[in-house]
A protein has these predicted regions:
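A generic structural signal for short, solvent-exposed coil/turn residues
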Residues: 4, 34, 66, 101-103, ...
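Substrate-binding cleft of extracellular glycoside hydrolase catalytic domains
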Residues: 79-195
Length: 196
């Protein structure tokens, strides 16, 4: 009986779907899995970039001002990755620095990608059908790959002082079940979205 009780406290290892996941990514997955059933992790978009009545103040966060601590989860956006600043007006160089700072505090970083419409050049909310043109053989495939190369370069630069990569939760096409984005459920077929 004691043995059975003892084994119930052993936490099973979660195996990532990516066989090439880094040790840091596996550790983040374990950390998230360990949180299940224990409570909620509070997150805040652009938490340390700007807030109510302030912008670019070192170590500042509205959540810290109000609650006394930083959020557990920090959200950032890669929209306008081909520019100096993202869609929220935060410089990408600052985002990298703030991701490193959040990671050093034990925070979890997430990255969404509100990429501009690849054909019209308008924002992500232009829901003109385009996904089929981004896939291999499509007219916009090469241009889309160039954008993804910018995303990859950004991610490759997210390293800790010891040179290890900072794990992030990448949410490239979030809210895909909605109608508003060009990648949304009414703007492409399921197989196109999966291929994307």
């Amino acid at each position: 009986m004691v043995w059975l009780i003892g084994i119930s406290f052993v936490q099973s290892e979660v195996v990532p779907s990516d066989p090439y996941a880094t040790r840091e990514t596996k550790a983040l997955l374990q950390r998230l899995h360990a949180q299940v059933g224990r409570g909620v992790l509070i997150g805040h978009q652009d938490a340390t970039a700007y807030g109510v009545g302030w912008k670019s103040e070192s170590s500042r966060s509205d959540m810290k001002d109000v609650c006394g601590d930083y959020p557990a989860v920090y959200g950032w956006d890669l929209g306008d990755i081909d520019q100096d600043r993202n869609i929220d007006g935060v410089a990408f160089a600052d985002i990298k620095r703030l991701i490193r700072e959040a990671d050093a505090r034990g925070g979890i970083n997430t990255l969404s990608m509100h990429l501009d419409h690849p054909v019209s050049g308008r924002n992500a909310w232009d829901n003109t059908k385009v996904v089929h043109q981004l896939l291999p053989g499509g007219a916009e495939h090469e241009g889309f790959l160039a954008t993804l190369d910018l995303v990859a370069a950004f991610l490759a630069d997210l390293k800790r002082d010891d040179g290890t990569f900072i794990p992030v939760v990448l949410r490239p096409y979030h809210e895909h079940s909605e109608r508003w984005p060009w990648w949304g459920r009414t703007n492409c077929y399921e197989d196109e979205f999966i291929a994307l």
